[in-house]
């Protein structure tokens, strides 16, 4: 089994719901943090094999891929998204460690991102029937 090491850690500032960061989407929040992490850790952007990101309140799609494309990571870097409530960022880090230990990747960037100001609004199914009536 290959050894895995954590070589750096960063986070964005904390902002309240609808506060100063409320206009930023998750890729706009995460990309600068990832860029700074890589620039200060001694690794190169081209060395990164995988980006693993947890996002529990996503609107769908693949947030990790969107974040990878918004950052300075090479376009070839895959984005793996985890939809997990509570400790999802830690799970992303643990999955990154397992990818390295298994020899599937050499360098993984991993963590979590949320924007409660931009979370999707989900309606119960009965509201769908009111908002979009079905005409038979």
Regions found by a protein language model. Give the residues of each.
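Short polar catalytic/cofactor-binding loops
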Residues: 9-14
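Acyl-thioester C-C bond-transforming condensing/cleaving domain
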Residues: 1-2, 16-45, 61-62, 68-136
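Residue-level signature of catalytic and energy-coupling elements of molecular machines
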Residues: 7, 48, 89
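Short glycine-rich phosphate-binding loop at a beta-alpha junction
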Residues: 47-54, 109
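Residue-level detector of conserved, well-ordered beta-strand and adjacent loop positions
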Residues: 7-8, 83
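Glycine-rich phosphate-binding loops at beta-strand->alpha-helix junctions
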Residues: 55-60
